[in-house]
């Protein structure tokens, strides 16, 4: 599972999930991508589960890039504990995903295989997603 090697502070405030993603909105490494259309926290377990679903369907063919990383800790207080007396212990790590963010990319497989692999991965995630292709740069070149 993914988690940071070390952090400066163990606990953080909850991150905002409003607005659209500022970066990571284009397919950069692979040919096809899985883009979030809603906002959510995605845990390291969900990322790993989606990765396993994709690689199993592709039968170890092609290459997968994970473009999100769970940097943010989330905390939880024990059951039946009264409010107050500090923030709870770190329960796990999450990646904050906003609409427009490309979460996974795939290359080296046909489009049908990539579409199905990303569909299987999307079932493991708490966000609505859509399949996107890389937009090739070209055609409109300035030759002066």
Swiss-Prot record:
CDD domains reported in the protein's UniProt record: Ribosomal_L16_L10e
RNA-binding keyword on record: yes
Lineage: superkingdom: Bacteria
GO MF term list: rRNA binding; structural constituent of ribosome; tRNA binding
A Pfam match: Ribosomal_L16
InterPro entries xrefs: Ribosomal_uL16, Ribosomal_uL16_bact-type, Ribosomal_uL16_CS, Ribosomal_uL16_dom, Ribosomal_uL16_sf
SUPFAM superfamilies: Ribosomal protein L16p/L10e (SSF54686)
Region (Disordered): 1-26
Biased composition (Basic residues): 1-19
Signal peptide segment: none
GO BP term, example: translation
Described function: Binds 23S rRNA and is also seen to make contacts with the A and possibly P site tRNAs.
Family of the protein in this entry: Belongs to the universal ribosomal protein uL16 family.
Subunit structure: Part of the 50S ribosomal subunit.
Protein name, as recorded: Large ribosomal subunit protein uL16
């Amino acid at each position: 599972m993914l988690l940071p090697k070390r952090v400066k502070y163990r606990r953080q405030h909850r991150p905002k999930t409003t607005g659209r993603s500022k970066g990571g909105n284009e397919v950069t490494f692979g040919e096809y991508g899985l883009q979030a259309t809603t906002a959510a926290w995605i845990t390291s377990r969900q990322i790993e589960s989606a990765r396993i679903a994709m690689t199993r369907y592709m039968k170890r063919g092609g290459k997968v890039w994970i473009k999100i990383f769970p940097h943010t800790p989330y905390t939880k207080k024990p059951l039946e504990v009264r409010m107050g007396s500090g923030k709870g212990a770190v329960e796990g790590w999450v990646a904050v995903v906003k609409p427009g963010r490309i979460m996974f990319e795939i290359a080296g497989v046909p489009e049908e295989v990539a579409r199905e692999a990303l569909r299987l991965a999307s079932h493991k995630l708490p966000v609505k997603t859509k399949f996107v292709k890389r937009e090739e740069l070209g055609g409109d070149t300035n030759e002066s």
